[in-house]
Design a protein with these regions (language model features):
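"A position-specific structural signal for the A-helix of alpha-solenoid helical repeats
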Residues: 42, 76-79, 122, 156
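Short, small-residue-biased leader/transition segments that mark boundaries at the very start
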Residues: 1-5
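Start-of-helix register in tetratricopeptide repeats
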Residues: 34-38, 72, 113, 118, ...
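TPR-repeat structural position
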Residues: 15-16, 53, 87, 133
Length: 165
């Protein structure tokens, strides 16, 4: 089945059908690396929507069968841990996202925010939740360099100013 059809099942919230189609595609072993990685991400989103977080995380980790992790996958895994208040694990994945090189010529599905803004703003949240205010403020400042008008960055800036950070 075509890539568009697989994604349409997801976008139309037909998650169980989408899971079957994505798994069949991946199990077929004939996909191009970037399509396989993106299929794993969509599979994970279906699993999370179906309230199956362990399977969602497994689908993300399955991307490692195809290549080194893309920043997009690192951010997805970071979110898995952030959503569960496992901040140290989330920090690991968001820092890894920042270390990944963006390659717009690879044919990969590139989400530019995953190579700068998103990991920085999420690292700000993680460090703040751990009580590491100075470190959180540093990451917020870094996020602001990517998106100086972003409402989250601006709210955090006021928050840290009020705290004296």
């Amino acid at each position: 089945l075509g890539d568009v059809y697989k994604r349409q099942l997801y976008y139309h919230e037909r998650y169980a059908d989408a899971v079957r189609v994505f798994e069949a595609f991946l199990d077929g072993g004939r996909g191009w690396i970037e399509n396989n990685i993106e299929a794993c991400r969509h599979l994970s989103w279906c699993r999370y929507a179906m309230k199956e977080p362990r399977e969602g995380l497994s689908a993300l980790l399955r991307t490692l069968e195809y290549d080194t992790p893309r920043a997009e996958v690192c951010c997805d895994v970071g979110k898995h841990f952030l959503d569960r208040a496992r901040y140290r694990e989330a920090i690991f994945w968001y820092e890894l996202a920042l270390s990944r090189e963006r390659d717009d010529r690879s044919g990969a599905f590139v989400s530019p925010d995953c190579y700068g803004y998103l990991p920085c703003i999420q690292l700000c949240v993680c460090h703040d939740r751990l009580g590491e205010r100075a470190r959180a403020a540093e990451y917020n400042d870094r996020a602001g360099k990517y998106k100086p008008d972003d409402p989250s960055y601006l709210r955090n800036k006021l928050y840290f100013a009020a705290q004296g950070s």
